[in-house]
């Protein structure tokens, strides 16, 4: 992508890029934590005839690949997950974990295909790949499609903080700020330790020009986020953007 894209103004292209960078930043952390914590989500998925058929098929390769993924050896997990799929083509959990691995490696097209396959194999009855696919569509700024997929996932896993978080991201992208704020707050009700939700709320409140709320969101976020350097950079970035937006509004108001 050229910068700025031909045929657009510098200001427009900067805002578009800024939005893409924001969604890339906030989506990376939860999607990896989703892979590490989805054992609880998986346990909530009703064991079906399909699960029983999968017992034993590709099990060893899947377990090895999943363990490597959880330990952070993303590249090493791929071969085992692909082997599990070759041994058991209906192994939807292997497709899901493979999608997570591809996402971490930056191979979004392959991740999208793997998540979609997991959805297809379960007839849309397994929420995690729907959350992950919605996250990818948010990152691609296909927000309407993301919202549709995420709504389906939330209907399956209504108690999922991750699902509500991504839904808020899609609604922010659609500029439906009241709905986005509600979804982000619901994510925090489900998981009060989801620091990224406070960062997302700061973005929502920034769009609403609610400076006191932004300040509160960032204060909580900085206290919670363990990656302090990244958290401080993101907080500083939002504060700078608010100052720029305020200055631009003042200049526009005083111009004849």
Please give the residue ranges for each predicted region.
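Terminal, low-structured helical/coil segments at or just beyond the last alpha-helical repeat
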Residues: 38-49, 207, 212-256
């Amino acid at each position: 992508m050229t910068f700025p894209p031909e045929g657009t103004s510098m200001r427009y292209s900067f805002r578009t890029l800024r939005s893409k960078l924001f969604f890339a930043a906030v989506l990376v952390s939860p999607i990896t934590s989703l892979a590490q914590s989805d054992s609880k989500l998986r346990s909530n998925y009703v064991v079906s005839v399909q699960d029983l058929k999968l017992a034993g098929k590709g099990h060893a390769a899947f377990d090895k690949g999943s363990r490597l993924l959880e330990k952070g050896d993303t590249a090493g997990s791929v071969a085992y997950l692909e082997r599990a799929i070759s041994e058991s083509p209906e192994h939807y959990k292997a497709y899901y974990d493979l999608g997570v691995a591809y996402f971490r490696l930056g191979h979004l097209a392959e991740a999208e295909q793997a998540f979609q396959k997991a959805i297809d194999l379960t007839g849309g009855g397994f929420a995690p790949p729907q959350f992950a696919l919605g996250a990818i569509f948010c990152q691609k700024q296909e927000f309407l499609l993301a919202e549709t997929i995420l709504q389906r996932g939330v209907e399956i896993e209504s108690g999922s903080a991750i699902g509500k978080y991504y839904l808020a991201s899609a609604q922010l992208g659609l500029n439906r700020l009241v709905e986005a704020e509600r979804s982000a707050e619901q994510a925090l009700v489900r998981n009060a330790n989801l620091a990224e939700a406070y960062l997302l709320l700061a973005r929502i409140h920034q769009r609403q020009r609610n400076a006191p709320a932004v300040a509160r969101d960032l204060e909580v976020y900085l206290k919670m986020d363990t990656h302090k350097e990244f958290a401080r950079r993101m907080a500083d970035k939002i504060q700078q953007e608010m100052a720029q937006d305020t200055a631009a509004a003042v200049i526009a108001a005083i111009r004849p």
